[in-house]
Amino acid sequence: MIEFQAPTPADKAWVDELLALGNLRGCDYNFTNLFVWQKAYRFELARMGNFLLIRLRGRTGNSYMYPAGSGDIAAAIRALEADATERGEPLRLVCLTPPQMAELEEFFPGRFTCTADRDGYDYLYDIDRLADLGGKKLHAKRNHIHRFVENNPTWAYEEITPASLPECLEMDQEWYRRSLQREGEVEERDLGDEGIALRAAMEHYEELGLEGGLIRVYGEVVAFTIGDRLSADTYDVHFEKAYGELQGAYAMINREFARWVREHHPEIKYLNREDDMGVPGLRKAKESYYPDLLVEKHTAILQKA
């Protein structure tokens, strides 16, 4: 069997090196996501030459991601097949993009059946469109921001620092409490997968090389966002929170962070705002910004010979 290990911050350097060889725009191929979401999906990593191998044990069963890196991809997939066989499992590959599916079919013709995972598609946006909000399609977003500025004249955007992380965590807990109250429920924030992931990101913020921004109104944090580089031209927005009762707060933190990324990373062309998980409200919100690209995701299962 392949010796997979759970990721730790110490793995970031070698994992990033291999991910850079793949230069993939899907948020699944990002060390931060592999680390902070490991309790939810039980990610495990291994290295095979210049390939990163990823195994996960999520709600849909035991799976592998398509190898990321460079070299003999067919050999890497055969190694995954052997590992799955030793574990008594079918080889299931998840988060495959269309180019990866085409490559899989080239080397293993007719051996895999593939199904689309629409709920997992990533939404990519041209960074200039999110930073400038030009054009008729985004007129409503400009109106939301105008209303936010009118109603909150003391608003200020600033970069997240280690000193302000506790305030962001406190704001997230309050955001969650308000959300649950609207739904008639009360429970602790850290019981949810996202709460665990966010706490891990904040606890290892500097080790993971994360960046972020926040908005204050009368000195209080009312919105924040956290992200990092995903590929040569794409930046991943991992977390974004704003008080929903403040009209335009989400639109404002979205715009301000896009402007910050554009200024500090001029090579970035797209912002990946990740998937909608099949949640109708999230899908509507992400579609309302009219994505420039969708990173399609598929699952491929090896059929018995």
Residue ranges of predicted features:
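Short catalytic-loop micro-motif centered on adjacent basic/acidic residues
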Residues: R92, E158, K269-R273
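Acyltransferase donor/substrate-recognition loop-hinge adjacent to the catalytic core
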Residues: P109-R189
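Short, glycine/charge-rich beta-strand/loop segments that flank catalytic centers
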Residues: P90-F107, D119-Y121
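Intrinsically disordered, low-complexity, positively charged segments
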Residues: A10-Q38
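Conserved active-site alpha-helix within GNAT-family acetyltransferase domains
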Residues: Q100-C114, N143, M277-L294
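Conserved donor-binding loop and adjoining core beta-sheet/short helix segment
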Residues: C27-P99, R216-G244
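A mid-sequence, solvent-exposed acidic-amphipathic segment
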Residues: P162, E170-A232
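Aromatic (often tryptophan-rich) hydrophobic motifs at membrane interfaces
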Residues: L210-Q303
